[in-house]
Amino acid sequence: MRLLFRQDMATVMSLFGISEWLLFGLWVLALVWPISYAIRHRTSLALSITVGLLLAYLVQVMGEFAIDREWVGGWLWWDFVLIPNRIDGGAWFHTLFSAGFLHSRYDPTHVLGNILVIALVGVPLEQRLGMRRFAAVYLIGLFGGSIAWFMFNLDSPIPSLGASGAAFGLFGAYLAGWPKDEIPFPLILIRKWPVIYLALFYFGMEVFRAYTTIGLNQASDVAHMAHLGGFVAAYILLPIVAKGGPYALGVEDGGPTNSSSERSRLNQIKSVMIDMSQAVDPWTARKMDIPRNIRDPLRSLLASADEPDTR
C-alpha cells in the first residue's frame, strides 16, 4: 500500500462530468470483467484478480494522460483512496475496500509487485482452498490491511492505496495452512521455495521496515502496517475459512504444483474403489465354466482396470 499527498487531490465524484464518468466506468469494467469471467467459467480467481488489477492500473495511467490534456479535471480517484482522518462516519467506510484496487500511477513497481505475489502465491493457494474460500481469504487480507493502517494512523490526512494488504494476506494464509508446500517464486533465485521461508522472509522484512518507519521515525511512502495487518488477519482466520475445504490443514504432499499432490488425489480415489479382484464375471454369475481361451485375457483385464485412470 502506497501513500500519496493531499495536494494531489482536486476533484470528487460530485464534480464529475461526462469525461470523468466515462473514465471511471472504464476503470470499473477493466477491474470487474476478468473477475466476472473467472466466476462464470470457473477459471482461476487469483489470475483474474491479477489481470483485473493490471488492466485497472492501465486505465489509471490513461487517466493521468487525460488529466495532462485537461480532458478530465484533477485527481480522479479522490473518493476511493483510504484517508484515516476522514473515516469518522459511514460515508467513507467504503474506502477500506476500494483503496485495495487502486495503485500509485507514479510507480509501476507498486502494482507489478502486488500482482506477482497474487499470481504466484494465490494460484496454488486457491487450488488448496477452492474459489470461494480463496475469495474470502483475499478479502480478509484486504480489509485487515486497511483496518490496521486506519487504526495506527487515526489522525493522518495522508491517503493510501494498493492491494499489498491482500497480497500479504495470501502469505499469511498459506503459512497458516500449508507451510511446507513448495511454490515457484523469484526470491534471490527463481526456483521452488517452501512457503514457510517465503512468508517469514516477507513478514520479517515488513516488521523491520515498520520499525525503522515508526520506531526510528524515518520517512517512508509505504504503508507497512497495512502489509502486516493483512498478513496477521489472514493467518489468524485461515483455519476457520479452510474448514471443510478440499485439503486438510498441514497436509504434506509438496503442494498443488507437485506430482505428489496428484498421486495423493489418485490414492484417495483408489481408497474408495471396489476391489476388482472380487468382481464376478458373467460366466461365474450364471454358474458356468469360463472358457479356457478367455481366462487369461479376463484376468489381465481385471488387473489392468484396477487403477483410477483406467476405470
What are these regions (language model features)?
Residues R2-A279, W283, N293-P297, L301:
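A detector for small-residue-rich transmembrane helices and their helix-helix packing motifs
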Residues T284-D289, S304-T310:
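Charged, low-complexity interaction regions
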